[in-house]
């Protein structure tokens, strides 16, 4: 993803901080992911050219920690707590997100809709 002067901006970078919800022994994030370098990118509904092997948000639980933090379906996860997520397997991404020792997850995501990103930032 790069920007060429004079061209419209098609994606923005967002920081999202999710405070995990404790349910018994579990810490809940409230979202699901898809993708990874070990997955078939042609099956990714969020990849524009069907070759992107990134990690994408595929579901956000209504009222859950991720929704409260502003995470959206289709967001591409670039970093988790400073760790690069651009070339990881699905399982590596899942493990990084669900580390028990981390009650807060700080994500760096790219979002395809500039209009949605601007609306979200105005609500915060």
UniProtKB/Swiss-Prot annotation:
It is found in: Cytoplasm; Nucleus; Cell membrane. The keyword Protease does not apply. Residues 15-112 form the PDZ domain. It is a peripheral membrane protein. Keywords: Acetylation, Cell membrane, Cytoplasm, Membrane, Nucleus, Phosphoprotein, Wnt signaling pathway. SUPFAM superfamilies: PDZ domain-like. May regulate a number of protein-protein interactions by competing for PDZ domain binding sites. Binds CTNNB1 and may thereby act as an inhibitor of the Wnt signaling pathway. Competes with LIN7A for KCNJ4 binding, and thereby promotes KCNJ4 internalization. May play a role in the Rho signaling pathway. Its main location: cytoplasm. InterPro entries: PDZ (IPR001478), PDZ_sf (IPR036034), Synaptic_Scaffolding_LAP-MAGUK (IPR050614), Tax1-binding_p3 (IPR017268). Pfam families: PDZ (PF00595). SMART domains: PDZ. GO terms for biological process: negative regulation of cell population proliferation; negative regulation of protein localization to cell surface; negative regulation of Wnt signaling pathway; Rho protein signal transduction; Wnt signaling pathway. The lineage of its organism: Eukaryota, Metazoa, Chordata, Craniata, Vertebrata. It comes from the Eukaryota. Transmembrane segments: none annotated. GO terms for molecular function: beta-catenin binding. The modification Phosphoserine is found at residue 61. The modification N-acetylserine is found at residue 2. Interacts (via its PDZ domain) with GLS2. Interacts (via its PDZ domain) with RTKN (via the C-terminal region); this interaction facilitates Rho-mediated activation of the FOS serum response element (SRE). Interacts (via PDZ domain) with ARHGEF16. Interacts (via PDZ domain) with KCNJ4 (via C-terminus). Competes with LIN7A for KCNJ4 binding. Interacts (via its PDZ domain) with CTNNB1; this interaction inhibits the transcriptional activity of CTNNB1. Interacts with ADGRB2. GO terms for cellular component: actin cytoskeleton; cytoplasm; fibrillar center; nucleus; plasma membrane. The keyword NAD does not apply. This is Tax1-binding protein 3.
């Amino acid at each position: 993803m790069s920007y060429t002067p004079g061209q419209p901006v098609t994606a923005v970078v967002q920081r999202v901080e999710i405070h995990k919800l404790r349910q018994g022994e579990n810490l809940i994030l409230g979202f699901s992911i898809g993708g990874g370098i070990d997955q078939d990118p042609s099956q990714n509904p969020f990849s524009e050219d069907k070759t992107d092997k990134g990690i994408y948000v595929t579901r956000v639980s209504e009222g859950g920690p991720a929704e409260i933090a502003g995470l959206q379906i289709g967001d591409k996860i670039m970093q988790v707590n400073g760790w690069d997520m651009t070339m990881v397997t699905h399982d590596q991404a899942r493990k990084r997100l669900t580390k028990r020792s981390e009650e807060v997850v700080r994500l760096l995501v790219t979002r395809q809709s500039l209009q949605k990103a601007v609306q979200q930032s105005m609500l915060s």
